[in-house]
């Protein structure tokens, strides 16, 4: 299938203090989140000057993708659109239409299936095309890539690099802990069932094996919403308490659920969890995310080549866990994943 452009589609984030509350209102629209809760979350962004790292990382990734496209002799413009902040996907798709783009691949900055990881991006695609009108380009979302060999390799290398920052006498006994964003149990059960959890668990197992860790833990982080609504557990903070009670004195935390340093990584892990670990006497090392590594750009262009050349998907682990291929103009990733 021929494509003329790439749209990098992401979550979005504020880029100044005055943008924080409007951004959070966009994220939570229709969910009835109290103003007090939004103001509390806003403090996380304001700690970093009101700037989320995600937009800057995505712009750097686009530069890396453009370099990889050029290296392969592929002439293809790369566009950038977001769900919750500028540049909004609606504006970006309109610009693609005005530039004469007829068909483009879409890479979303989530490796996973499920509603928030995949189907919500399909909604973004459909909304962007609807806003652009009848001349909107055809948009083909690239497949889920949770088991792509380069993703596994990047996280495995990041774990080894994180381990090297621990005191030498603690490295061999450090406990490896994988984290991913928690979601409501009800939402998890609607997509698969347990599709998201199985994909995360599969990726964690592949990364642990590649990094040389036969034992590890899989936990969740960054839950929100009413306490009476069950979310995926255990929480990373609660698990750290369990490890401290067992006498564990060194932990490597790998945010395998994130392909970039979202605020949930740089605040929830690098600040809150780090403070908790220090109080418990645990040496904590956090593995980096792919961010804008050249290897991540290569992964993106690999996915484009799979689409345009009809190549078989590169998957580690024999495809034992469901992964869904490309879809067109906002089709659902899997029939059960309706929201």
Swiss-Prot record:
Keywords, comma-separated and alphabetical: Cytoplasm, Heme biosynthesis, Iron, Lyase, Metal-binding, Porphyrin biosynthesis
Primary residence: cytoplasm
Pfam families: Ferrochelatase (PF00762)
Any GO BP: heme biosynthetic process
InterPro entries from the UniProt entry: Ferrochelatase (IPR001015), Ferrochelatase_AS (IPR019772), Ferrochelatase_C (IPR033644), Ferrochelatase_N (IPR033659)
GO cellular component, one term: cytoplasm
Reactions catalysed: Fe-coproporphyrin III + 2 H(+) = coproporphyrin III + Fe(2+)
GO function term, MF aspect, one: ferrochelatase activity
Residue positions binding Fe(2+): 181, 264
Record has Nucleus as a keyword: no
Binding positions (Fe-coproporphyrin III): 52, 121
Location relative to the cell: Cytoplasm
Pathway(s) per entry: Porphyrin-containing compound metabolism; protoheme biosynthesis
E.C. number: 4.99.1.9
Entry superkingdom: Bacteria
Family from the record: Belongs to the ferrochelatase family.
HAMAP family, alphabetized: Ferrochelatase (MF_00323)
Role, per record: Involved in coproporphyrin-dependent heme b biosynthesis. Catalyzes the insertion of ferrous iron into coproporphyrin III to form Fe-coproporphyrin III.
Record NCBIfam families: hemH, PRK00035.2-1
Full protein name: Coproporphyrin III ferrochelatase
Protein species of origin: Mycolicibacterium vanbaalenii (strain DSM 7251 / JCM 13017 / BCRC 16820 / KCTC 9966 / NRRL B-24157 / PYR-1)
Gene it is expressed from: cpfC
């Amino acid at each position: 299938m021929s494509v003329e452009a790439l749209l990098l589609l992401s979550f979005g984030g504020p880029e100044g203090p005055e943008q924080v509350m409007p951004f959070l209102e966009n994220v939570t629209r229709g969910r009835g989140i109290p103003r007090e809760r939004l103001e509390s979350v806003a403090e996380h962004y304001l700690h970093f000057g009101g700037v989320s790292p995600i937009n800057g990382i995505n712009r750097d990734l686009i530069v890396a993708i453009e370099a990889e496209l050029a290296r392969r002799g592929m002439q293809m413009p790369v566009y950038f659109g977001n769900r919750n902040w500028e540049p909004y996907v609606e504006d970006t798709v309109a610009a693609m239409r005005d530039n004469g783009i007829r068909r483009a691949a879409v890479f979303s900055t989530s490796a996973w299936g499920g509603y928030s990881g995949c189907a919500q991006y399909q909604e973004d695609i459909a909304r962007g095309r609807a806003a652009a009108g009848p001349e909107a380009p055809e948009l083909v979302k690239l497949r889920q890539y949770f088991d792509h060999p380069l993703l596994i390799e990047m996280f495995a290398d990041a774990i080894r690099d994180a381990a090297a920052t621990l005191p030498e006498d603690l490295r061999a006994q450090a406990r490896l802990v994988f984290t991913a964003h928690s979601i409501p149990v009800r939402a998890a059960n609607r997509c698969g069932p347990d599709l998201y959890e199985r994909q995360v668990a599969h990726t964690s197992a592949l990364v642990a094996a590649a990094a040389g860790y036969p034992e590890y833990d899989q936990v969740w982080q960054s839950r929100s919403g009413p306490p009476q609504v069950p979310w995926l557990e255990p929480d990373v903070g609660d698990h750290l308490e369990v490890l401290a009670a067992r006498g564990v004195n060194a932990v490597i935390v790998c945010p395998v659920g994130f392909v970039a340093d979202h605020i949930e990584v740089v605040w929830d892990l690098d600040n809150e969890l780090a403070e908790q670990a220090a109080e418990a006497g645990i040496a904590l090392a956090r593995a980096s995310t792919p961010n804008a590594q050249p290897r991540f750009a290569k992964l993106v262009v690999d996915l484009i080549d799979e689409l345009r050349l009809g190549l078989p998907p590169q998957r580690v682990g024999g495809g034992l866990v469901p992964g869904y291929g490309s879809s067109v103009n906002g089709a659902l990733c899997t029939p059960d994943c309706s929201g």
